[in-house]
Amino acid sequence: NLSSNGETSVTLTLQLEQGLSYDIAFWAQPEGLDCYNVSDLKAIKIDYTKCLANGTHRNVFYGNVFDLRTSQNDEVNVTLKNPFSKIEVLTTTEDVEAVSTLGYNLDNMKSCMKVKGIATSFNALYGMAEGEKANVSLIPSNIPTDIQTIKGKTYRLLASEYILGFSNQAIDVEVELSSENEQKSLSFFAGKAWAQHEQTFTLYDRYFTSSIEFDIKIDSEIN
């Protein structure tokens, strides 16, 4: 265990017996998280039922060194990377305004993703998702207020998750939104996202309402 005090780099000193070869796994996570069981870095267990949706609070990093042979005063540079795929779901700001007229105020609602077939275990030494595939739903939290511009249109972020998927795996993504007292709720299928380590996959559309234009003309003739 080593605290970085918020820094992005830290020095770790280990006392290793000379003349031997070592494979070493590294894992970094925020303090206070209980959704990761790191008793075995080659089989880190992820309990998604303890993971809060929509945030970077549970973001983690891993790294590895293979066949390290020690000599006096060795210094080894290790870069830690993110094992997750980040999935974002956005809808147009016009859609947000339209759905608010139906009584859905997104500023007072919570959201979470439901994803199917993702991994529940991670091998930090080899950087591989492992374990059985599981269908999971994270703990709902406040809908983000982030606004993004994509191809000239503005979109609001509805949900954002860090997902551990198997290599190049297509994942079905559903989004659930609910009010504090659960009197108002919405759910929809957002689409398929690709699970690739260290990559962000963005799903964007108009998910709540459709804009329909009627071309109306008056036929004044009377037969």
Which role does the model predict for each range below?
Residues 1-38, 96-195, 214-223:
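Tryptophan-paired
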Residues 1-96:
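Short, low-hydrophobicity acidic/polar segments
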Residues 93, 205-207, 220:
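Non-catalytic surface loops within mature trypsin-like serine protease
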Residues 196-210:
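Phox homology (PX) phosphoinositide-binding domain
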